[in-house]
């Protein structure tokens, strides 16, 4: 067994390694043991505390244990050992590492039962299987992915994977956590074009997917330093059976075409109980990074740029324009954001809440520099607030920066431009014509109104609403009903008479009161609301 010195000193206290199956545990100083298996380097350590790099608190390697002569590992394709990647954090590196600890406190250590055993014969077999699939699918994946990534659906509600035998439906299984499930019936490559997430599978498998926020797991001031950069969405992925998944393709918005980005900077961040574990992807393609024989966790692409490197990172980006109709003064919102389908969907949803309508525009043709400032201007000399937008990444769900301007009744076309602040280079322009707004307004469905729904379905609600106790409490809490009005409804003798008394009382209070009533009914009897909405289609 080859030995190699690591920069970390081993703990002076020896702990008994966890017992696995019937194997006997041995007390060893395992911090210096490295076992080479093919191209993989497995660091064996008897304490996960040894694997936390003291300067950053980040775990670069999963815990492993030794029983008899067998090495067990947790991650089948783990990141390089601490020795191999410690050059990212040299002792004279003065970058602000301390705020980047991500609370990676090693209190939740893995037990031996959490670490699957893999014999050398099994590894050889798995490698052969993976190689066969990759050799058959790789050419298809590479050529097709480059095409499909330019055609990613902007509609995130497109809940289908494109597979080798056609489309595969994605099922929403938990709306509160935004969690989805999909069953891949056969081996092959599958792509969810609405998100850019892809899988290469060996056999049929069920995959569950949820979407996370970087800001909930690490401090986003990372991206304001030149050393770190969020490179794509965050996905929480599980699979059953796990071994059926040969590759995961994680989307990123980093531009590789200019040759300014070193693919060795790409890391996959896994968020686990013990902290953040970093893994190098097997390869990096123009629109996604590949994990082979992956472990499953909350994961996403993170760039670690070598210390002292001074350059701007080019990324693919989107310009999103929304207009808010008004008879006297039409308002526009303009966003400049990284090309992230999940981020676009979040902005769409937020704008839709305020009846904003997105205009169809093309993105910037060339990559833009992350962290650079850009100036928004227009041909009509309309006041833009703010004029300057900084191209940065904010997780979906956070407040996104945008520029706003008013165009009156807009009887003439408006030319919009975005220029790079430092050099004055034009990076994007478009023309918005009055007819564009008319076409969008004609094709867009009218905004949904809870008040209108209650009015249109008065008779159905009067006949079908059930127990009103919770609804009455909601209306009183929101100051729609007084205590006396609530008692008047409750004094009615029959269910339908109570319903009629409530509906009539709230309708007299206006649309805002009806909106509150609709929200309450939707939360307490969603099936009734869903049924009535279907009847109205």
From Swiss-Prot:
The annotated site for (Microbial infection) Cleavage falls at: 59-60
Q: Which residues form the CARD domain?
A: 446-536
Record-linked CDD domains:
CARD (cd01671)
Where is the FIIND domain positioned along the sequence?
161-446
Site annotation Cleavage: residues: 296-297
Q: Where is this region: UPA?
A: 297-446
Q: What is the effect of changing residue 495 to E?
A: Abolished formation of inflammasome filaments. Abolished ability to induce pyroptosis
Q: Which InterPro entries did the record assign?
A: CARD, DEATH-like_dom_sf, FIIND_dom, NLRP_Inflammasome
Annotated phenotype, changing residue 279 to A: Partial loss of autocatalytic cleavage
Q: Where is this region: Disordered?
A: 1-28, 113-133
Tell me the compartments it is located in: Cytoplasm; Nucleus
> What does the activity regulation annotation say?
CARD8 inflammasome is activated by HIV-1 protease activity: HIV-1 protease cleaves CARD8, promoting ubiquitination and degradation of the N-terminal part, releasing the cleaved C-terminal part of the protein (Caspase recruitment domain-containing protein 8, C-terminus), which polymerizes and forms the CARD8 inflammasome. CARD8 inflammasome is inhibited by DPP8 and DPP9, which sequester the C-terminal fragment of CARD8 (Caspase recruitment domain-containing protein 8, C-terminus) in a ternary complex, thereby preventing CARD8 oligomerization and activation.
Reported tissue expression: High expression in lung, ovary, testis and placenta. Lower expression in heart, kidney and liver. Also expressed in spleen, lymph node and bone marrow.
Skewed-composition ranges (Basic and acidic residues): 1-23
**UniProt-listed PANTHER family:** CASPASE RECRUITMENT DOMAIN-CONTAINING PROTEIN 8 (PTHR46985:SF4), NACHT, LRR AND PYD DOMAINS-CONTAINING PROTEIN 1 (PTHR46985)
Function description: Inflammasome sensor, which mediates inflammasome activation in response to various pathogen-associated signals, leading to subsequent pyroptosis of CD4(+) T-cells and macrophages. Inflammasomes are supramolecular complexes that assemble in the cytosol in response to pathogens and other damage-associated signals and play critical roles in innate immunity and inflammation. Acts as a recognition receptor (PRR): recognizes specific pathogens and other damage-associated signals, such as HIV-1 protease activity or Val-boroPro inhibitor, and mediates CARD8 inflammasome activation.
| Comment on protein domains | The disordered region is required for activation of the CARD8 inflammasome.
Q: How does it assemble?
A: Interacts with DPP9; leading to inhibit activation of the inflammasome. DPP9 acts via formation of a ternary complex, composed of a DPP9 homodimer, one full-length CARD8 protein, and one cleaved C-terminus of CARD8 (Caspase recruitment domain-containing protein 8, C-terminus). Interacts with DPP8; leading to inhibit activation of the inflammasome, probably via formation of a ternary complex with DPP8. Interacts with NLRP3. Interacts with IKBKG/NEMO. Interacts with DRAL. Binds to caspase-1 (CASP1), CARD16/pseudo-ICE and CARD18/ICEBERG. Interacts with NLRP2 (via NACHT domain).
Q: What is this protein called?
A: Caspase recruitment domain-containing protein 8
